[in-house]
Amino acid sequence: MPKRTFTKDDIRKFAEEENVRYLRLQFTDILGTIKNVEVPVSQLEKVLDNEMMFDGSSIEGFVRIEESDMYLHPDLDTWVIFPWTAGQGKVARLICDVYKTDGTPFEGDPRANLKRVLKEMEDLGFTDFNLGPEPEFFLFKLDEKGEPTLELNDDGGYFDLAPTDLGENCRRDIVLELEDMGFDIEASHHEVAPGQHEIDFKYADAVTACDNIQTFKLVVKTIARKHNLHATFMPKPLFGVNGSGMHFNVSLFKGKENAFFDPNTEMGLTETAYQFTAGVLKNARGFTAVCNPLVNSYKRLVPGYEAPCYIAWSGKNRSPLIRVPSSRGLSTRIEVRSVDPAANPYMALAAILEAGLDGIKNKLKVPEPVNQNIYEMNREEREAVGIQDLPSTLYTALKAMRENEVIKKALGNHIYNQFINSKSIEWDYYRTQVSEWERDQYMKQY
C-alpha cells in the first residue's frame, strides 16, 4: 500500500463526496485486539481536532479506573472507506494513536511505542525499517447459529486450485476488497493444511505495515463471514496439520540504500545485516512470548510442521529461525519465521527491531549459518554447533522474557509489565484446566 498524505481539508472533502455517515476510530490494545470508537460524521471536527475521548480503564492493559480518560489522535493518512459499507451511508476508518490528558503519547499504546523504538533507530543513522508480512489463516464453516465449527471449507493443499480449494471464492473476494482499500497484493494461494490460506501484500514502512496487518485481519474476518465461513488467525487450530505463521521480512534503510546489501561480499550482505541478525538470534528467546503470545502458539512451534523450533540462521535452509531470502539489492532482507498471526504486530516488530539494534550497537558477531536440516539433527549435534531451542511453552517464553532487558526496553515498562501479568494469568488458567484429551487417556484406565 503506497504511503499517502492527507490533510484535514482532504478528510472533510472525502467524507462529503463519499456520503460517509460514520467514522470508526481504530486502535489496538496490548493483546493485539482491534478496538474502535464509532461516531457519526457530525463529530468529524472533534475527531480532526483530537478531541475524541474514551475510557481507557475498559481496555485490557491500559490504565486504572482513576486515571482512565484517554484521547484518540487520528492518523489522517490511514483514512479509508470500508468497501462493504453502503446503503444508508458509508463507514470510514481512521487509525489512531492514544494520548493522555496532558497531551503526551500514552506509553501503553503499542503503535506509539513502535514509533518510540523507530526514533531510536533513526538516532543510529537509519531512516526506515520495512516489513513485509506473510499472514496465514484458516477458514471453517459456520453452523446454523452462525457459530464456528471444526468443519473445514475444503481439503486442499499447498497451491491447490479449484475444485479442491472451495475457499477460493472467499479468498478472491478478500483480495478484491483489500485492493479496493489500496493494498498491493503480491500473492494469494492455498497453504499446506486443508482450509488454510495465505495472502501476501507488499512491504511498507514499519508503522504502515503493522496498520496493514490489523486492517487485513479485519477484512479477512468480515468477508469470510459473508461466505458463511469463520476465519481464524489462531496459530494451531487443528492437530496433525501445519499451523498458521506470519513470517516477518524486515530490512533497514539509509535513505534509498538498503543497509543490509553489499554486492562485494560472499553472501551479498553488509556487516550491519550480520550484526542485526546476531542481535535477533541473541534475544530470540526473550521476544518469543511477544511474537507467539498464546498458549496455543507453542503447539505450532514443534518439529515436523515447517515451523522453527531452533535458534539459528541460514541463507537457503527453511528449518532455522532466520532465513535470508535469495533476493538482493533493494530487496535484501531477513525473514524471521517464528512470528504467528496472533501476535500484536506493533509489539512484535518493536521487539525484533530492538533486538537487531542491540546487535548493531554492540557489534555482535553472527554464528556460522546452518545449512543442514535442523529437524534431522539430534540434541548433541545441535549443542555441538551452539543451536539453542526456542521456548516450548508460554510459561518458558515468559520466563525468558523476564530475564531479557533488551525486550523490556523494546516495550517500555508499562506494556512489558501489563503483558507479562496478563499472559501469566492466561498460563495459570490453562495450567489448571482439564482437557478432553486427559479424560480420554485416563478416565477408564485409572
UniProtKB/Swiss-Prot annotation:
**What organism does the record attribute this protein to?**
Staphylococcus aureus (strain MW2)
Q: Which PANTHER family match?
A: GAMMA-GLUTAMYLPUTRESCINE SYNTHETASE, TYPE-1 GLUTAMINE SYNTHETASE 2
Task: Kindly list the residues the record flags as site (Important for inhibition by glutamine).
Answer: R64
Question: Ranges for the GS beta-grasp domain?
Answer: 18-103
Q: Which SMART domains match?
A: Gln-synt_C (SM01230)
- List the catalytic activities from the record: L-glutamate + NH4(+) + ATP = L-glutamine + ADP + phosphate + H(+)
Q: Where is the GS catalytic domain?
A: 110-446
Q: Under which name does UniProt file this protein?
A: Glutamine synthetase
Q: Which family does it belong to?
A: Belongs to the glutamine synthetase family.
Which amino acids does the record list as binding Mg(2+) 1?
E134, H247, E335
Q: Name one GO cellular component term.
A: cytoplasm
